[in-house]
Amino acid sequence: MGKYIFKRVLMLIPVIIGVSFLIFVLLDLAPGNVLDMIAGDYTPEQLAELEHELGYDRSVFYRYAMYMWDLLHGDLGTSYIYKAPVWDLYIQRLPSTLKLAGASVLVSILLSIPLGITAATKHGSLTDNVSMVAALLGLSMPNFWLGLMLIIIFSQGLGWFPSSGDKDGILSLILPAITVGTGLMATLTRTTRSSMLDVIRSDYLRTARSKGVPEKTVVKKHALKNALIPIITVIGTQMGRTLGGSVVTENVFSWPGVGRLTIEAVKQRDTTTVTGCIIMSVIMISVVQLLVDLTYAFVDPRLRAQYASSGKKKKAAAAAKKAGEAEKGGV
């Protein structure tokens, strides 16, 4: 298990290099740079000095090498737009993104999994058909459109919730969480239903029913446990994306999270902030995916046994190799 985690961490290195280089190249191709945005705050001499310091008088490859060298030393750089270290900016915005991600995922799980189970156990019924139509609608609605509709109806129309910011506590969180959670809820409902149907129709559950095991026990104790892996995969994927920053939703609701910080930095050609935010988002997504993979082993005993047998086989092969080398040396 330890070797598996180590390999996954190593796999993150080329991903970070590739993503950061792509960001540098794309922003370099765009007209203007961060110096154009801050020119009014400096004299021409200071701007020339700053241009040399930031490497804008050299190639994008040189600037990228400078950035990666600083990154290796744990420095995400300094934003000349916000006049603060990128790490501080990221940490300042992260709690808002965590609140939004946690609320949307939690509500989605609490609603969609029971709905998916009900749809599967009542396959072909009115409940099943209505839930699938609702899930299809949830998948079809773009986040920006849904967010705007919620603002028009519940904020501007009824005045129940604030339309922007996070100053009103949980009231400010409700509309953004619904916007982010709707797509996840739809996906999770369909996944739960599909996975449960596959398990419910399996032979071993038919055997359990034939032995007189109550249907509730069959569903809760046997079917749900064996249907969890696809469900966990969807939850982990969506959680990772949300932690990376719900860019569209955060901008629609002026939510002060990582996604909005990234968009603001893009508009102002703040390459350092954009790169730092995206690198941290990639790390967050990768960590969540790693946790999902490790969760599989706890949910499914077969995978746990596979990890154990894989480790034993490698140890046995290494021991056999050493024994062979010792035998050759003795000869």
PLM feature spans:
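An internal, D/E-rich "acidic patch" concept
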Residues: 57-113
